[in-house]
Amino acid sequence: MSAPQQQHNIQQQNIQQNIQQQQPQQNVQQPQQVIGQPQQQPVYKPVIQINKTLPQQQPQQQIPQQQQIYKQAPQQIYNQISPPIQQNINSPTIVNNTPPTPVVTTPTTTTTTTQSNYSTNRPNININPASPISSTTIASPVTPTVLTSTPPTTITTPTTTTTTSTPTTTSTTVITSGTGQPSLGSIESSIESVLRKNNLVNTTNFSPVQNIGTTTPPPSSTVVGITSPTLTQTTSSPITATSITPTITSIPTTTTTNTTSPMSIGTPSSTTPVVSSVLPTTPTTTSVTAPITTTPPSSSVTTTTTTIPTTTTGSNNSVQITGTNPMVYDSRQMANNSSNITSNPTSTINTPTTTTTTTTATSNSTGTILSKQKKEKEKEKERREREIREKENKDQQDKDKGLNSGGGGGGGIGNNNNPNNSNNPNNSNNPNNPNNIEPEVLGKRKLIELLQQISPNEKMDEDAEDILSVLADDFVESTVAFACTLAKHRNSTTLEVKDLQCHLEKNWNIRVPGFGNVEQYKTFKKPHFPENHKLRVAAMKKSIALTQASSRKQQIREFKEQQKELKEQQQQEELKQQLQQSKKQKLQLQQQQLQQQQQQLQQQQQQQQQQQQQQLQQQQQSPSSKF
């Protein structure tokens, strides 16, 4: 056989071995070629298979470099714990014969499978002792225990996350293989026994997976961990206690992740959880605040209870912190938790506890009772107020009747300072009173007096009087009402002048000095004038009187002169009128004379004409007679 054929066959064998390592579950049997038979099977058939599987070799080149980093840390930690476990197998120890009952949930599983050639015979369990959240951290010794193997079980590890609204619980599902490897349940029982020996477990409310926090390695490594949120606790007022009760909210939302990785070639796949357990030690002062679920409508009640330091024997009788998380466990969960607890050696613990609990009443019955009590109180208050109002209305009616009978429209102003008006400023407008008479604050007389003070020569119409009276009533009502509110604000039952002053100055810019404040009062003394000043004042008054008299005389003279002038003017006008009348009469007489003369002339002319005609007639008759 030639050399290139031998090299080719060797490469094929190496590739087949790599394929078998990558796929251990599939029993792939490929034909092996004999070196001495070059002409048996076709050479290119396995090459096709090689080309199909070649892309799967790429992650192998990157993973082995990082596998070595993650191989050492979990194994070293596990080797530190495993020797005392193997040495003390025959030693008498307390064994948890009752395995923890699993809490069955319906998680939404999201499986992520990664394959690698890395094979281990031990689970990568990272048990790191840690102390809870406290001001001081003290390491607790770990006692050797016996690990009992149990069949594969589904275990939920609730990790509480504290939020401002409704907290949620996330659980992780861990499945261990039954190939002789220690399961998670046995590890939990061992952790539980260690915690009990150190008196760190509350026997009534204990969950074996309460304090287990999970960590995840980088995504490039083959060791795939279980992803879940870590336990977060917020510190508040310190609570001195020797045990930490588990807190699980009532509305959990579970998210589970199942991861598988091959442990060895040819063996079924199993999970390799990387679990870091938190082993609480004996804390000196721990501050724990658990989430409190509230549902509206609720009435918050804050109670502070201080207990005398008690002495308890045995870890089963350890002090329980009450009120940290109400309505967490139901009866079934309490029964399941109680079944996982075993007896531990007794010890004496002195625990002075001071717990402050803040509870919320969420039941509907208590809410209805409180609402009924509030309604009854409101009804009683309304009843008392009605009685007070009726009494005040009666008193005010009597006073109003007395004022109206006494007369005087302005009398109603003084009535506004009555302390009864401070509680009910508008009692006069109450329609429930049948005999209610609205007093007029300002009558017509008062309005006329005010108008005369402003302008004495003017008068008012009836419409103006009505409008002014309405405006005055509104103004007085508004001022009294606002002043009453100020008096109520001062928690007083009497109306004072300063209330009215405050309202008038702020809203109307009206200042009323001389009331309320002592600073506004001023001392007034009569002035002492000397005699010279008095004489001067008298002389001044005389001179003023003389000047006034002389001015009056001058005015009288001027008036007389004016009257004389007026008389003269009238006389002149009368004379003129008389002259005109005389002239008219003369003209009329002349005209009459002319007319008479004309008439006489006409008569004479007529007579002459008649005479001439007679003469002519006579002359004519005369010759006829001659003939």
Curated annotation (Swiss-Prot):
Residues 368-400, 547-622 form a coiled coil. The keyword Transcription regulation applies. Residues 91-121, 140-177, 246-313, 335-366, 415-437 have a biased composition (Low complexity). One of its GO terms (molecular function) is DNA binding. GO terms for biological process: chromatin organization; RNA polymerase II preinitiation complex assembly; transcription initiation at RNA polymerase II promoter. Residues 1-39, 91-184, 246-439 are annotated as: Disordered. Residues 122-139, 314-325 have a biased composition (Polar residues). The keyword rRNA processing does not apply. It is found in: Nucleus. Pfam families: TFIID_20kDa. One of its GO terms (cellular component) is transcription factor TFIID complex. Residues 373-402 have a biased composition (Basic and acidic residues). Its main location: nucleus. CDD domains: HFD_TAF12 (cd07981). Residues 404-414 have a biased composition (Gly residues). InterPro entries: Histone-fold, TAF12, TFIID_TAF12_dom. Keywords: Coiled coil, Nucleus, Transcription, Transcription regulation. Residues 440-511 form the Histone-fold domain. Part of the multimeric TFIID complex that plays a central role in mediating promoter responses to various activators and repressors. Belongs to the TAF12 family. This is Transcription initiation factor TFIID subunit 12. It comes from Dictyostelium discoideum (Social amoeba).
